[in-house]
Amino acid sequence: MEEYEVTTKDSGSGLSVIVAGGGTAGHIEPALAVADALRRLDPAIRVTALGTERGLETRLVPERGYPLELIPPVPLPRKPTVDLLRLPARVRASVRRTRAVIDAVQADVIIGFGGYVALPAYLAAGRGVLRRRRAVPVIVHEANAKAGIANKIGARVARAVLAAVPDSGLPGAEVVGIPVRESITALDRTALRAEARAHFGLPDAGPVLLVFGGSQGARSLNEAIAGAAPQLAAAGISVLHAHGPKNTLDVPETGGTARYVAVPYLSRMDLAYAAADAVVCRSGAMTVAEVSAVGLPAFYVPLPHGNGEQEFNARPIVAQGGGRIVPDSELTPKYVIDEVIPLLLDRTRLTEMGRAAAGAGHRDAADEVARIAVRVAR
């Protein structure tokens, strides 16, 4: 049997909280936002993050100053494959490791954010088959418009079930929004505008369109925006475009004062949001939460495959007038010319949509989840 070294809880310390949300940024960022909120609520609270060695958490969690405990991943096959036969053994190994972490840090509550890190945490929190273990209360948070398998299982045993939007598929869930880091929710775009534009080499005057398609970029967004570059420049609109580290962008030379700044990725999203007047982006749960939190009008372009959850993520914001949903197949240079450019030139409409976006979001979601966690733990 493998032996693990785990950071243990100091005697006499505050509450011990485990956040379980690894793999993708959509699971990790809400977990870290809640971790930050817990520290703001009570600096004595100990937060431990669960993750796997192959997820983004191996970089993101240490950067934010939290201990990370690794467990074996438990990917849930979507279709019957040979991996389904390996699932029971993988679950047992991961639950055993998670229990070791729970015991070592003397966890008072576990907050799960879905994905293959959360499922072992939910299963390990119980008293076990022989009913000899100390049960740890569980809180489930679902960021997506359609709940995943892990959170559906966790919701059955959870003390509190939270969701980003109504009708997530988790009965009785309390809608709290998506936890977003304070550097975004507290962002003063007006105050940072000049600094942000200087950071990216954008002109002080004139509208700026921000374009990004997630951590890997999006080809359809790249082709549509770059294809309309001459018309954007002619209208005096600058572009800040994160095209993805694996993609290249062919942008024709344009004259005038407007600039087209193309970068592989954006490490300072706070400055990117502050520099922009509108956004063209995908509609992952975290993207929608951040864009609405900062009050930016958006053209949301859901992924054209999967279960359609990206469109559902954007619907509440769009219903309030804070954005538009554009099918991937309809985002073309012509659409940018006919729809995006006129909006960026209409300051009144931009202001109205920005206010609607900010009003539809949940800027205090991280603090609310933190308060619920403390209440459940005690």
Swiss-Prot record:
Its main location: membrane. It catalyses: di-trans,octa-cis-undecaprenyl diphospho-N-acetyl-alpha-D-muramoyl-L-alanyl-D-glutamyl-meso-2,6-diaminopimeloyl-D-alanyl-D-alanine + UDP-N-acetyl-alpha-D-glucosamine = di-trans,octa-cis-undecaprenyl diphospho-[N-acetyl-alpha-D-glucosaminyl-(1->4)]-N-acetyl-alpha-D-muramoyl-L-alanyl-D-glutamyl-meso-2,6-diaminopimeloyl-D-alanyl-D-alanine + UDP + H(+). It is a peripheral membrane protein. It is found in: Cell membrane. Cell wall formation. Catalyzes the transfer of a GlcNAc subunit on undecaprenyl-pyrophosphoryl-MurNAc-pentapeptide (lipid intermediate I) to form undecaprenyl-pyrophosphoryl-MurNAc-(pentapeptide)GlcNAc (lipid intermediate II). PANTHER family: GLYCOSYLTRANSFERASE, UDP-N-ACETYLGLUCOSAMINE--N-ACETYLMURAMYL-(PENTAPEPTIDE) PYROPHOSPHORYL-UNDECAPRENOL N-ACETYLGLUCOSAMINE TRANSFERASE 1. Belongs to the glycosyltransferase 28 family. MurG subfamily. This is UDP-N-acetylglucosamine--N-acetylmuramyl-(pentapeptide) pyrophosphoryl-undecaprenol N-acetylglucosamine transferase. It comes from Nocardia farcinica (strain IFM 10152). The gene is murG.
